[in-house]
């Protein structure tokens, strides 16, 4: 199951419940390599499990993901080897700019307003606006988007069900 991935580098960056075990994928890739197969086509790439494991095993891979949100997650994960020091300085710069931004808007869509306190919504909005306004290299911009997306669950006091659906009225425990 994908739950196993939450202990693995890169795979644990995003909890994708529709995914499957990276260890199992790696085992299959190694097995097929012994049969001389060194190319993989994944028509449902999801969050990139097969593509990442292919890269780790030196196997050429191609993936297709139709959902734009999930595609962006996979793309950010596949850029995992971007220089960490450069990313860190860019991410901290983005955060500093967002902290300096004042959001006065208080009206947000009902679903958003029911999932987050107004102070959190305004901070998230500042992050989003700063991200949209900031020019960055594509890999860094994608990864910063990924980080902002990844904190949405933890910044909300609303709980989630097993399949990540929101549960209004249930708090994180």
Residue ranges and their predicted role:
Residues 1-4, 46, 157, 169-173:
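Short intrinsically disordered, low-complexity coil segments enriched in acidic
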Residues 1-35:
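S-adenosyl-L-methionine
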Residues 36-46:
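Conserved class I S-adenosyl-L-methionine
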Residues 47-59:
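Conserved SAM-binding loop of SAM-dependent methyltransferases across substrates and taxa
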């Amino acid at each position: 199951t994908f739950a196993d991935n939450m202990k693995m580098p890169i795979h644990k960056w995003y909890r994708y419940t529709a995914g499957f075990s990276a260890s199992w994928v790696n085992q299959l890739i190694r097995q097929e390599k012994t049969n001389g197969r060194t190319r993989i086509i994944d028509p449902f790439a999801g969050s990139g499990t097969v593509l990442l494991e292919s890269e780790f095993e030196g196997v050429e891979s191609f993936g297709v993901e139709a959902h734009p949100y999930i595609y962006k997650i996979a793309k950010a994960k596949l850029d995992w080897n971007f220089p960490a020091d450069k990313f860190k300085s860019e991410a901290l710069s983005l955060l500093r700019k967002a902290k300096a931004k004042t959001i006065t808007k208080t009206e947000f869509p009902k679903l958003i307003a029911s999932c987050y306190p107004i102070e959190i919504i305004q901070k998230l909005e500042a992050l989003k606006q700063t991200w949209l306004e900031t020019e960055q290299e594509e890999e860094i911009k994608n990864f910063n988007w990924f980080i902002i997306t990844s904190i949405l669950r933890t910044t909300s006091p609303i709980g989630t069900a097993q399949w990540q659906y929101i549960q209004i009225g249930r708090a994180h425990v």
